[in-house]
Amino acid sequence: MFLNVCMCVCVCVRIVLFHSSLNMAVASSSSISARSILFKSTFFEAPRFFMKSVSNPSKLSLNFFLFLPRIPSTDATGMSSNSLNILINPISRLFNLFGTWDFFKSARNSSCVLPFSDTCLFRSSDISLSTLFTVAELLYFFNGVRFKSFLSMIAAEVISSSVSVGAAGVTLGSCGVTFFLFNVMGEEDSSMGVGVKSDLVSSTVSSLLSSSPSPSSSLLSPPILGFFTSVTLVRSRFLPSSILLMNSLLLMRWLAPNSNSSSGSVS
C-alpha cells in the first residue's frame, strides 16, 4: 500500500515535469519524435493509466509500469537534452522494475492474474512470461533506449493488451495496435509520412472500437485481435517480426485454456 501511494505521488510529479520539459522541447524543435511523444503522453498514455487505475485499483503499480514514458536522451540534432533527463530517466526505469516485479509476484502467488470473461489470460503457471518481462526491463535499465522497441515495450504491451478498461469489461486495443501507437508514430526513418501513419492509426482504432467486443465473445478477444493486427502491420513493415512472435505465443496461451475447458465440458 505504501509503495502504491509513493507511485501515485511520483506519477503526479512526473506528469508535471514531463510535460513542462516537452513543452520546451516542442517549442524549440519541430522534430517528429518530440511531437509524437507529447501526443502519446497527452492523448493516449495518461487517459489509459487513470482509467485502469479506477477500474482495477489493485493493479496500480502495474498500471504505473505501463504508464511511464521515456524522454529521449538526445534531441533531433543529436545533442544531449537538458539535465532534467538525467534525473527522470533513471527514476522511470527504476519504477518500471518495481512494476514488473509486482506482476511477477502476482503471477507467482495467484492462480489467476488477469481474468477475462469466464477464462484467465495469465495464470500462475506463466512464470516464463513474467521472467521475460523482468529480463526485458533489466535489459532496458542497463542498456537504455536501444532495447526500447525490441524488448521493453513488448513486455508492457503484452500485459496491457489483456487488461480490461471500464466497468463493462470491454477491452480497448490489442498488442499490435498499442505497440503501433507507442512506437511507429515516433519513427523518423520510415518512408511513409506522418499524415499517412496518423490516418492508419485512426482507421485501425476506429475499426476495433466499432466492433465493440463483448466479454463473452472469444473471437473478438484481445489476443486474437492482436495477432491479426500484428500480422497486417508486420506485412506492411510497420512492426518487427518479434512482435508477431509474441502475439502468436499469447494467442496460443489464450486458446489453450479454452480448448481444455471445451474438451472437459464435452466429456
From Swiss-Prot:
Output the Gene Ontology cellular-component terms.
Answer: membrane
Membrane keyword on record: yes
Per the record, membrane topology reads: Multi-pass membrane protein
Keywords carried by this UniProt record: Membrane, Signal, Transmembrane, Transmembrane helix
Entry's transmembrane regions: 125-145, 165-185
Q: Where in the cell is it found?
A: Membrane
- UniProt keyword Transmembrane present: yes
Judging by the UniProt lineage, the source's domain of life is Eukaryota
Q: Using the record, list the residue span of the signal peptide; answer none if the entry has no such feature.
A: 1-27
Q: What else is known?
A: Partially overlaps IES1.
Q: What is this protein called?
A: Putative uncharacterized protein YFL013W-A
**Organism of origin:** Saccharomyces cerevisiae (strain ATCC 204508 / S288c)
Organism phylogeny: Eukaryota, Fungi, Dikarya, Ascomycota, Saccharomycotina
